[in-house]
């Protein structure tokens, strides 16, 4: 099988809260701008929910960031099979 094998230790982290605060946006403000509920933004910020690719791009655009700068893998245990 081709592709990347992800171990269970790999987590997606984000810097949404910090960049949202920098722009003086509440969770509700950001949620309205990207078309989701405030609870969705909260869950993403806490790492309880991984956004779709589209939502990640929308959030990044609203925060003036690239997706790569806003989201990161917390562990480098990603390997090719």
Where are these regions (language model features)?
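Alpha-helical residues within the helix-turn-helix
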Residues: 21, 32, 61
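Short, charged recognition helix plus adjacent turn
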Residues: 2-3, 61, 71-81
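DNA major-groove recognition helix of helix-turn-helix/homeodomain DNA-binding modules
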Residues: 54-69
């Amino acid at each position: 099988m081709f592709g990347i094998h992800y171990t269970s230790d790999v987590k997606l982290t984000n810097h949404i809260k910090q960049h949202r605060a920098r722009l003086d946006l509440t969770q509700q403000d950001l949620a309205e701008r990207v078309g989701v509920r405030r609870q969705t933004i909260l869950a993403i910020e806490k790492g309880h929910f991984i956004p779709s690719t589209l939502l990640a791009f929308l959030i990044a655009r609203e925060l003036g960031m690239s997706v790569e700068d806003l989201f990161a893998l917390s562990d480098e245990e990603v390997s090719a099979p």
